[in-house]
């Protein structure tokens, strides 16, 4: 097995059950890995959580779940760590979650070195290695072929959801901290967090990072009916995004 040498952060809590094997696999795959404690309001006291829920509804018309706020706070902890790395402003740091699954390690290693980490001087500030269950769409005008099977370019921002496999620079971390300083949308609603910013965003398709899907979500309750409904909705939106991306 190829072992990556990528500075990586994994959001994880000892309160999560059934994901220890996932973490062991990530440790075997990645050379530099740091664990950051996840935030779970249902298990721990989060100051002003009720007020934060109320404020999110006031700002957007829809209240965030406490678990969604916890997820956002967890990623903000990682962004703070990266934002403080002032000596490596252009270096990329990989961010994963406890159920992240690297499905193409060699591709991740090579693409990371050749695309986002060229002498620590990447043209991208934020790069998605997997998002929205592999349904990220890349704008055709920016798309370049990479290693036969893959395409790299600027993603259609409305096709990017999920925080289980992305990398950012300290510059991007600082901007995300600023954009999410007021609790309003879930952490993976990038179409809101990244609007009117000058960040250079990239993505790869097919995805090289996915999720294991062997344990239940820690954010929202999902039964079989909801999963089927979500899958159908995703197919409809993916078809729409495919057409939009073709003309972008």
Predicted regions, residues:
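An acidic/histidine-cluster motif and surrounding catalytic segment
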Residues: 2-96, 100-248
